[in-house]
Swiss-Prot record:
GO terms for biological process: mitochondrial electron transport, NADH to ubiquinone; mitochondrial respiratory chain complex I assembly. Keywords: Electron transport, Membrane, Mitochondrion, Mitochondrion inner membrane, NAD, Respiratory chain, Translocase, Transmembrane, Transmembrane helix, Transport, Ubiquinone. GO terms for cellular component: mitochondrial inner membrane. The lineage of its organism: Eukaryota, Metazoa, Chordata, Craniata, Vertebrata. This is NADH-ubiquinone oxidoreductase chain 2. It is a multi-pass membrane protein. Belongs to the complex I subunit 2 family. Its EC number is 7.1.1.2. It catalyses: a ubiquinone + NADH + 5 H(+)(in) = a ubiquinol + NAD(+) + 4 H(+)(out). It comes from Ailurus fulgens (Himalayan red panda).
């Protein structure tokens, strides 16, 4: 893709998301979603091979269906309340339809099937945009809709997403699919707290984006797509092997790393709302995800695969890939736990 075209497309993607973020009018929000969806498709098709085209088609069909359900919910709300503003969604049917549409855009269970397939069919850079930036707009609308959302509907979808993420990631060897199931699980954690304390969703989103960006950048730096290729990186990029270990454990929510903060605060908030069984079940479901993160960590950093070469380190040219953003992202993704008291004040 030529740079001027790429700049125009990325500007449209960012403009669509910003329109959703700053609007309180349902029609403008819907237009922002459509701008964002139509502009992201050329980015997904950047490779221009049959697999990327198939992934883009699946993404388009899912997002178009979600947009149709969202518009239907908006029209029902308009007929019931006579207003286009987001703060007036008194009709439970309209609210439920909008919630289902937004969760379909996010990839929550039972509408999660498109996320692993689309992520597997596109490049790592496109997958990074899909699993980070594309989550911001639907979550911002859920944040503003929080008072009118049915908590039972959203909580059931959140718990299903955590279970699906845990079971789905267990037998995966493709790194993109592992990160897709990781995204489904983290979306479940975010939406579980939306109704009870929406600001905690912000914290979880920020932490998730930092950890996912760092992981994708490391995989792009290593040019790794499978667990096997990642396991051979120890003698080419020894430092990145250690960094991947830290990031995987942080994504799994293991203390004392940064990924533990949102899980800790969400479980604490749900317990304050006299919910004991649900956070216990969520913590158990998180163990499934932690298992495949630990397995990936073990194959990457704790085993040494046999080599026919007597040299431990491989000879290679100097890597010219720029990783300017990687050091601060890794620091924030792994070492923010001591700053939890300040986050408690903010959130």
């Amino acid at each position: 893709m030529k740079p001027p075209i790429f700049i125009i497309i990325m500007t449209t993607v960012i403009s669509g998301t910003m329109m959703v973020l700053i609007s309180s009018h349902w029609l403008l929000i819907w237009i922002g979603f459509e701008m964002n969806m139509l502009a992201i498709i050329p980015i997904l098709m950047k490779k221009f091979n049959p697999r990327a085209m198939e992934a883009s088609t699946k993404y388009f069909l899912t997002q178009a269906t979600a947009s149709m359900i969202l518009m239907l919910g908006i029209i029902i709300n308009l007929l019931y309340s006579g207003q286009w503003t987001m703060l007036h969604t008194p009709n439970p049917m309209a609210s439920n339809m909008m919630t289902i549409a937004l969760t379909m855009k996010l990839g929550l269970s039972p509408f999660h099937f498109w996320v692993p397939e689309v992520t597997q069919g596109i490049s790592l850079s496109s997958g990074m945009i899909l699993l980070t930036w594309q989550k911001i707009a639907p979550l911002s609308v859920l944040y503003q809709m929080a008072p009118s959302i049915n908590p039972n509907l959203l909580m059931s979808m959140a718990i299903m997403s955590m279970l699906v993420a845990g079971w789905g990631g267990l037998n995966q060897t493709q790194l993109r699919k592992i990160l897709a199931y990781s995204s489904i699980g983290h979306m479940g954690w975010m939406t579980s707290i939306t109704v009870y304390n929406p600001t905690l969703m912000h914290l979880n989103l920020v932490m998730y984006i930092m950890m996912t960006l760092g992981t994708f950048m490391l995989f792009m730096y290593n040019s790794s797509l499978t667990t096997l290729s990642l396991s051979y990186s120890w003698n080419k990029f020894p430092l990145t092997t250690l960094l991947i270990l830290m990031l995987m454990l942080s994504l799994g929510g293991l203390p004392p790393l940064s990924g533990f903060i949102p899980k800790w605060m969400i479980i604490q908030e749900l317990t304050k709302n006299n919910m004991i069984i649900i956070p216990t079940f969520m913590a158990i479901a998180a163990l499934l995800s932690l298992y495949f993160y630990m397995r990936l960590t073990y194959t990457t950093a704790l085993t040494m695969f046999p080599s026919m070469n007597n040299m431990k380190m491989k000879w290679q040219f100097e890597n010219t890939k720029k990783i300017t953003l990687l050091p601060p992202l890794i620091i924030m993704s792994t070492m923010l736990l001591p700053m939890t008291p300040m986050m408690l004040i903010l959130y």
